[in-house]
A protein has these predicted regions:
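Terminal low-complexity/charged segments
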Residues: 1-175
C-alpha cells in the first residue's frame, strides 16, 4: 500500500477530511486534517479493512510560536502491522484554544500519551478519562515544552568566554 492508495481510500470515504498532505524525508505520508474531523479520520484509518492502521505508535504535541493561529499541534503516528506501513496525521490549532478530542476511545494507550502532552504543552484532550499532570508538579502554572521560555538563565556568567581569556570570535558577540 502506497501513499496514493491510502489517500484514495480516505478521499473516497471522507472527501473533506484532508486539508493537505506531504511525504516527509523519511518516506512517511503526513496528512493534515482539522480538529473537528480528527476522531472520525482516525476511526476510519483504524477500522477500515483496506487501511488497517490499528496501532497508535505514539502521539506528540508541537509548538510553533511563529505560526499565528496554528501555534500548537498534535501528531498521531499510526502503523499498519500487517502491511508494515506508517503514516502521521497532524492537526494544528491556536494556543488560546488548545482543545482536542481524546483518542482514548480508539486506543487505550493514548491515555498516558495525552496526559504527557497536556503536562508539557497544555493541550486539553476533551473527554479524556483522567487528564492530569503525569510528570510535573500539579501546581505548575506553565507548560515547559512550549517555546515561550528562555533555555538558560540570562543572568548566568559562568559561560561567558571573557572569563576564560577569550575575546570571542567572528560572528559572535557578547552583550
Amino acid at each position: 500500500m502506497d501513499s496514493e492508495q491510502i489517500l484514495a481510500q480516505i478521499t473516497e470515504k471522507m472527501p473533506t477530511a484532508i486539508l493537505s498532505t506531504e511525504v516527509a524525508r523519511d518516506g512517511i505520508l503526513n496528512i493534515h486534517t482539522s480538529r473537528e474531523q480528527i476522531i472520525e479520520l482516525l476511526s476510519l484509518l483504524r477500522d477500515d479493512a483496506q487501511l488497517g492502521f490499528n496501532f497508535l505508535t505514539t502521539l506528540n504535541a508541537i509548538h510553533f510560536p511563529e505560526n499565528a493561529g496554528q501555534e500548537l499541534g498534535v501528531i498521531y503516528h499510526l502503523h499498519n502491522w500487517q502491511k508494515n506501513v506508517r503514516i502521521r496525521v497532524k492537526i494544528f490549532f491556536p494556543k488560546d484554544d488548545a482543545h482536542v478530542p481524546t483518542a482514548t476511545n480508539l486506543w487505550p494507550t493514548a491515555n498516558w500519551m495525552e496526559r504527557q502532552e497536556y503536562d508539557f504543552f497544555g493541550v486539553v484532550f476533551t473527554g479524556h478519562p483522567d487528564l492530569r499532570r503525569i510528570l510535573n508538579l500539579d501546581d505548575l502554572e506553565v507548560f515547559p515544552m512550549r517555546k515561550e521560555y528562555r533555555i538558560e538563565d540570562g543572568t548566568r556568567t559562568d559561560k561567558d568566554d571573557r572569563f576564560f581569556g577569550r575575546d570571542g570570535h567572528v560572528g559572535r558577540s557578547f552583550e
